[in-house]
């Protein structure tokens, strides 16, 4: 019983750290159903991929230290470690929680990139049609017709 209580306390603390690290801007996009991906590039630009619209520069910038805090918070939450000398990257599944449903996470740190960067891929609540891919420019009309 005491171990379960301790585990819940540790889990909740890790969620609090992640929520604080992500900040209000990213949490806002994580709660939007039409946003399927949130990413921070090495230049610090925060981009989103919106269903049916495509990629948008949000105009928000994250400094490298904050980006790194997000990466390490997700490593901790997902039970992963990052060895900068061996592989300065992280691939993780973010478990479902009170913050948001489960997501996929990919991050790169200096050694692979100039500054920390990451992508959070949410599970889409919508189903993409082939026509959606053509509209977004991910597929040509000729490719659509061939399929």
Per-region residue spans from a language model:
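P-loop NTP-binding catalytic core
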Residues: 49, 55-146
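N-terminal anchoring/assembly modules that precede and organize ATP-driven motor systems
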Residues: 1-57
């Amino acid at each position: 019983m005491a171990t379960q209580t301790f585990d819940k306390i540790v889990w909740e603390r890790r969620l609090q750290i992640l929520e604080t690290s992500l900040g209000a801007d990213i949490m806002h996009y994580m709660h939007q159903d039409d946003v399927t991906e949130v990413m921070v590039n090495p230049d610090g630009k925060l981009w989103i991929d919106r269903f049916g619209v495509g990629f948008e520069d949000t105009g928000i910038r994250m400094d490298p230290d904050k980006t790194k805090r997000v990466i390490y918070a997700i490593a901790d939450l997902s039970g992963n470690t990052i060895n900068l000398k061996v592989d300065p990257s992280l691939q993780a599944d973010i478990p479902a929680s009170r913050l948001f449903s489960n997501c996929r996470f990919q991050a790169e740190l200096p050694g692979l990139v100039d500054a920390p960067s990451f992508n959070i891929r949410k599970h889409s609540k919508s189903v993409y049609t082939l026509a959606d891919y053509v509209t977004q420019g991910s597929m040509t009309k000729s490719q659509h017709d061939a399929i």
